[in-house]
């Protein structure tokens, strides 16, 4: 019985050691992969696609407006078989930006009155 217990403890120790080694290898691989993804992201982030330009090459490359990032919207033009993708600002975000701009202007007027 002591032999079985000793053998079990030894087996458990070896198993946990090998698992730790495998996890270290996986962590190192994840770190390397993460670093390469970050480098690609930095390289891609240098140039953005302006509004109403083609974004089919990279659908996450649209530029930011004052508050929000534009969205790559794809559609099929009438009578066309090819998909067209352009960077556009959704209407609800457009209205939110207009409201924020008006609020800023109104805040400036209040500051002048009570300033």
From Swiss-Prot:
Signal peptide: 1-20
GO molecular function: toxin activity
PROSITE patterns linked to this entry: SPIDER_CSTX (PS60029)
UniProt xrefs under InterPro entries: Spider_toxin_CSTX_knottin, Spider_toxin_CSTX_Knottin_CS
A family per Pfam: Toxin_35
Cellular location(s): Secreted
Family per similarity comment: Belongs to the neurotoxin 19 (CSTX) family. 01 subfamily.
Name of the protein in question: U3-lycotoxin-Ls1a
Originating organism: Lycosa singoriensis
Phylogenetic placement of the source organism: Eukaryota, Metazoa, Ecdysozoa, Arthropoda, Chelicerata
């Amino acid at each position: 019985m002591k032999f079985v217990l000793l053998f079990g403890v030894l087996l458990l120790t070896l198993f946990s050691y090998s698992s730790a080694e495998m996890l270290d290898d996986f962590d190192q691989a994840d770190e390397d992969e993460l670093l390469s993804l970050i480098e690609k992201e930095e390289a891609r982030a240098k140039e953005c696609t302006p509004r109403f330009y083609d974004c089919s090459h990279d659908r996450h490359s649209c530029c930011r407006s004052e508050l929000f990032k534009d969205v790559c919207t794809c559609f099929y033009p009438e009578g066309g078989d090819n998909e067209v993708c352009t960077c556009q600002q959704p209407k609800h975000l457009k209205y939110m930006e207009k409201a924020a701009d008006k609020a800023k202007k109104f805040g400036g007027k209040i500051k002048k009155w009570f300033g």
